[in-house]
Amino acid sequence: MQLSVVIITFNEEANIGRTLQSVQPLVADGKGEIIVVDSGSTDRTVEIAKSRGAKVFVEEWKGFAAQKNSAIDKATGKWVLSLDADEEVEPSLLDELTFLFQTPTTTDDLNARFERVRALTYLSTRQSRKQIRLMMKAQGNPNSFFAEMNGYLVARKNLFLGRWIRHGGFWPDRKLRLFRRGTAIFEDRLVHEDIKLTQGISGQLRGSLLHHSYPTLSDYIDHMNRYSSLGAQMVVAKGKLRFSFINIVLRPLFTFVYNYFFRLGFLDGREGLLLHMYHAVYVSWKYAKAWELSRQKNTLSS
């Protein structure tokens, strides 16, 4: 089997159908499979996933990294495409993924494929494009170089209130999404789990994912509340516990000014203003909650 699409879910009925529909051509006719690991959804997520041909596994929540690694462990394809439930494969990326799974047989095929992959790098050594071309030429065998290609970074178009946010650090937001099975692992973090390619080299694809992240302000405020609590735990773990004017007021203000003005967030209109304003509030919440946690610990220990 060529490809396994893996997704973790919890109450994603508003998103999962769109996501699965976008990858159907990649897995049709036995070319691949869809693995969904659900953590006890109470809506129609599981029903929708099964109706789209996904293999659904229901497991207790173990944390983002552990849950995603569990989904990867269930994959049987040579390649794994790891998606969030609110991500959609755009047509251009779909074409590129289809192309990448074709096996080159001649030098011309190899060169054509190379032109479809931009800024190939070693994740560890950041090897230059020129060096990689020399490697390809030295190896001679058209298949040998791409045998070492173990992962691809994919850009994400983050949507906020329906608008693609192109500035302020939100684009291109590249993530390692496609990798050979057995060559990547998610590393556990309280906030924003990270995936690491453990061997081989990685490239960047030209196509992108649509990330339907925050369709409403309520969604973003809920996200801010959850992630500021997790971020506060990280702050406490680092020992930055003091309630200070810098952390509660100046740091959020600097965050807003930097992202909105210096990183051109103002070019994203009203949506950009709201996003960066609320992101600054998130920073303030994070440090305020860290102070609250430290105060609670001091109360319990006294």
What are these regions (language model features)?
Residues 30, 51-53, 76, 198:
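Short, structured coil segments at secondary-structure junctions
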Residues 44, 65, 83-100:
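Acidic donor-binding/catalytic loop of UDP-sugar-dependent glycosyltransferases
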Residues 22, 34-47, 84:
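A conserved acidic beta->alpha catalytic loop
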Residues 59-75:
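Glycine-rich, basic loop-to-helix element that forms the pyrophosphate-binding segment
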Residues 7, 12-26:
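Short, well-formed alpha-helical segments that are part of the catalytic scaffolds
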Residues 2-4, 33:
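Cell-envelope/extracellular polymer assembly enzymes that use nucleotide-activated donors
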Residues 80:
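Short aromatic/hydrophobic "clamp" motif used to bind/position activated sugar donors
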Residues 72, 91-294:
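Catalytic-site signature of metal-activated, phosphate-bearing donor transferases
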